Amino acid sequence: MVGKSVVLFVLAAVLEIGGAWLVWQGLREQRGWLWAGAGVIALGAYGFVAAFQPDANFGRVLAAYGGVFIAGSLLWGMIADGFRPDRWDVAGAAVALVGVGLIMYAPR
């Protein structure tokens, strides 16, 4: 169950962060509406992925995904835009990922 959940979180992050990045590129970097449109499609697809999480609680899944989004956004920025996080960015992402583990995978 944990493996499936992690894969779904990674897929959700790629779709949401990638979609937002495509919209940003289309509008802010003036790459055009095709980029922005592709981003909107990716963002829409992200909305479906959370529904496949093994945990049935929407609030828990989306709260935990927030931590994945934090770390994933920093990683995306590093890969796609050459962003270099400082130690506080890394520390914050680590705290967020610990939160993901507690929220999603702590024994209940």
Swiss-Prot record:
Main subcellular localisation: membrane
Native organism: Mycolicibacterium smegmatis (strain ATCC 700084 / mc(2)155)
Keywords for this protein: Cell membrane, Membrane, Transmembrane, Transmembrane helix
Family that this chain belongs to: Belongs to the UPF0060 family.
Gene Ontology CC terms, in alphabetical order: plasma membrane
HAMAP family registered for this protein in UniProt: UPF0060 (MF_00010)
Top-rank lineage group of the source organism: Bacteria
InterPro entries: UPF0060 (IPR003844)
Transmembrane portions of the chain: 6-26, 32-52, 61-81, 87-107
Protein name as catalogued: UPF0060 membrane protein MSMEG_3252/MSMEI_3169
Record localization: Cell membrane
Membrane topology recorded in Swiss-Prot or TrEMBL: Multi-pass membrane protein
